[in-house]
Amino acid sequence: CTYYSALGNNDAAYLLARAIQCFTPGIPQIYYVGLLAGENDLELLENSKEGRNINRHYYSLDEINQEIERPVVKDLFRLLAFRNTAKAFDGDLKITMIDEGAFTLTWATAEESASLTVDLPTNKFSILHRTAAGDEQIF
């Protein structure tokens, strides 16, 4: 099952899950089908009878060009670019519980911070990046 399909092909839930992944310690790794928010490939599964092929769609160049125009994929690319360039992720992580199902993950150095505020029941989140130059809202 693809990660996107496991979340009901729900763009908001998928981006929230990927945002949490990007804010947890370590280097986030995303399989190519996940990078394109790919759905289960039931046709490939049926034709191959190989269970793991459900999440191994073989994209043509045309399909890739179409998929990268989807808002959920563009947002994921933007999130990953932020994760790869923000110096805050070189700092320390602080977890703050707000309420049941709501929390903030904040990475900070002396120069900058990046905060992910999450509300799991609504699939909503926001990211605030603070730099020496000022505040910048990412999502």
Q: What is the predicted function of each stretch?
A:
Residues 1-139:
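Active-site and adjacent substrate-binding regions of carbohydrate-active enzymes
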